[in-house]
UniProtKB/Swiss-Prot annotation:
Protein name: 3-isopropylmalate dehydratase small subunit
Database matches in InterPro entries: Aconitase/3IPM_dehydase_swvl, AconitaseA/IPMdHydase_ssu_swvl, IPMI_Swivel, LeuD, LeuD/DmdB_bac, LeuD_type2/HacB/DmdB
Top EC class, one word: lyase
Nucleotidyltransferase listed as a keyword: no
Matching CDD domains: IPMI_Swivel
Keywords, comma-separated and alphabetical: Amino-acid biosynthesis, Branched-chain amino acid biosynthesis, Leucine biosynthesis, Lyase
Organism, as annotated: Helicobacter hepaticus (strain ATCC 51449 / 3B1)
Molecular function GO terms recorded: 3-isopropylmalate dehydratase activity
Purpose of the protein: Catalyzes the isomerization between 2-isopropylmalate and 3-isopropylmalate, via the formation of 2-isopropylmaleate.
Pathway membership: Amino-acid biosynthesis; L-leucine biosynthesis; L-leucine from 3-methyl-2-oxobutanoate: step 2/4
UniProt keyword Iron, yes or no: no
Subunit structure: Heterodimer of LeuC and LeuD.
Length: 165
């Protein structure tokens, strides 16, 4: 599994209320959620983001209310992976459950800047900053996590398991 895109970088303690404000929680429409992703801290995010781009955060990314809407909004906006110094645990689980790749690495999150082009090889745990060819090593996802992400989420993965049983 691989991803490549441009960096959209944010700071520490980006909470779920900022990722998708509560005023939009009355919809389950993924495109509608994507249209409002990050609007309270980056009003141009939706216009800037392209399919495959990478979001980078600081410490405690995804803190706050436990809402699956937050990783759904990020994924539906076109983001292929989030790299952060650390994640709120419930956000981490919700992201994996909906098939959004996330990588926890202080070194990588610190080194990448807005606009850097990044290539990620999830199978090998290699992240490359294409701007300066700097490479970083991370721990690859365990096989079952890769399967969940490849299946586009936990529910799809379960359906595949049932179909193959």
């Amino acid at each position: 599994m691989k991803a490549q895109g441009f960096v959209h970088k944010y700071g520490d303690n980006v909470d779920t209320d900022v990722i998708i404000p509560a005023r939009y929680l009355n919809t389950a429409d993924h495109k509608e959620l994507a249209n409002h992703c990050m609007e309270d801290i980056d009003k141009d995010f939706v216009a800037k983001v392209k399919e495959g781009d990478i979001m980078v955060g600081g410490w405690n990314f995804g803190c706050g209310s436990s809402r699956e809407h937050a990783p759904i909004a990020i994924k539906a906006s076109g983001i292929s992976c989030i790299i952060a110094k650390s994640f709120a645990r419930i956000f981490y689980r919700n992201a994996i459950n909906i098939g959004l790749a996330i990588i926890e690495s202080e070194e990588v999150a610190q080194s990448l800047e807005n606009g850097d082009e990044v290539a990620i090889d999830f199978d090998k745990g290699i992240i490359t900053n294409c701007k300066n060819n700097q490479q970083f090593s991370t721990t690859p996802f365990p096989p079952f996590i890769q399967e969940i992400i490849n299946a586009n989420g936990y529910l799809n993965w379960i359906s595949k398991q049932k179909a193959n049983a």
